[in-house]
From Swiss-Prot:
Gene coding for it: ctaF
Record's keyword terms, sorted: Cell membrane, Membrane, Translocase, Transmembrane, Transmembrane helix
InterPro entries per record: Cyt_c_oxidase_su4_actinobac
Function: Part of cytochrome c oxidase, its function is unknown.
Main location class: membrane
Assembly notes: Associates with subunits I, II and III to form cytochrome c oxidase.
Example GO BP: electron transport chain
The name this protein goes by in its record: Probable cytochrome c oxidase polypeptide 4
Taxonomic classification: Bacteria, Bacillati, Actinomycetota, Actinomycetes, Mycobacteriales
GO MF terms held by the record: cytochrome-c oxidase activity
EC nos: 7.1.1.9
Family: Belongs to the cytochrome c oxidase bacterial subunit CtaF family.
Pfam families: Cyt_c_ox_IV
Organism whose genome encodes this protein: Mycolicibacterium paratuberculosis (strain ATCC BAA-968 / K-10) (Mycobacterium paratuberculosis)
Length: 139
């Protein structure tokens, strides 16, 4: 996880530097003054990358060194169970559709569609979380 953390720290630094340069250059050369939307978007993108980098740093401290993190690793060092994955689940598709409904409601500013989208999102996430606790797949 150290490599991933370094990668996202580099990305965060790049976006912060780009936001600073963009803000200064638009303030100096743009006819309407500084363009705040782009500066804010670049700064927030850097902030999101920094959040991911910080998460990877915390995870790297908690777990043992992975085969990906040292040079002398063999392919067989990474063998083993990776976790449980649900290959037949339809819930992620429903979550995406629900998010689309909410996004269209926000874009068109239709409060009833926003509420419907949020309700669909909550019910879809509940379905995903409880997928293996209800119904025929119950373990």
């Amino acid at each position: 996880m150290h490599i991933e953390a370094r990668l996202f720290e580099f990305i965060a630094g790049f976006f912060f530097l780009t936001a600073l340069l963009y803000g200064v250059l638009t303030a100096l050369f743009a006819t309407g003054g500084e363009e705040w939307a782009g500066t804010t978007a670049l700064a927030l993108t850097g902030g999101l990358a920094l959040i991911v980098a910080t998460f990877f740093r915390f995870v790297a401290r908690r777990i043992d060194t992975r085969p990906e993190d040292y040079e002398g690793a063999e392919i067989s060092d990474g063998a083993g169970e990776l976790g449980f994955f649900s290959p037949h689940s339809w819930w992620p598709i429903l979550i995406a559709l629900s998010g689309s409904v909410a996004a269209v409601g926000i874009a068109l500013w239709l409060p009833w569609l926003i509420v419907a989208g949020v309700m669909f999102i909550l019910s879809s996430v509940a379905g995903l979380v409880f997928e293996y606790y209800l119904g025929p797949e119950k373990h």
